[in-house]
Amino acid sequence: MPSFGENPEETIIREIEKFVSEHPGNRKPEPDGIPYYDTPLVGFADANDNLFSEFKDIIGDFHLTPVEVLAQSFPEHTASWDGSSVISWIIPVSQSVRESNRKETRCSSKLWADAKIHGEELNIQLQEHLASFISEQGFLAIPPILSPFFEVLQLDKVGSSSNWSERHVAYAAGLGTFGLSGGLITTQGIAMRCASVVTSLKLNPTQRSYSDFREDCLFYNSDTCGRCMERCPSGAISQEGHNKDLCMVHCAQVMQECDYNAGVPSV
């Protein structure tokens, strides 16, 4: 196995951690120097895991499996996709950024907005970097959401939904379970960014420590909490779950009210 050695999983994890820690966009400009994101959580899944096929019933038939992603991305590859893998990661929002946002009731804090802007740029660049890193070792790799066939659909029942859900992929890779709000609850909390790369590189799957997709949500597992309903300024979260339409309307209004981009340098 070229350059990956006997433990390709550790090589991948170190590469992701190194990229995030050294990225210039992961730190507020001096004099503060506050980091936006903490050390990533990384998980792996077998591209042929049956759970990905089940997502077609749970999310919709339009949702792609990892094998479909690989087949569409590399049509010249005619061999079996057995042994292929999914690499998923979580980039947790730092404690400083979280604390800055806790006092806000309608608009997010400026630090939170800065972290979101830079975090999205960082995450896109990380997907590109990791795919290139793996490809240079002779394996096929593609970030699904950066592929030409990635799309976001508007559905009558659930509103906006994409054909590759990073949260569901992270769930399959053992990185967390879902809460009432629809967010993914990880060992580092729910404030995070996530992404993935699908590859022909064989990696050992991360064991899922949970048996239910809502296992870590206190509202579902013990009928307590419900803080996300109280916290949501638009009323988009209820006992029925997350209303994406209400959420998007609120976000659009807030973006007009708050000059989030002011003073945020591009990376």
Indicate where each model-derived feature is located.
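Non-catalytic, usually N-terminal nucleic-acid engagement modules in DNA/RNA processing proteins
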Residues: M1-K116
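Catalytic cores of enzyme domains
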Residues: T105-V267
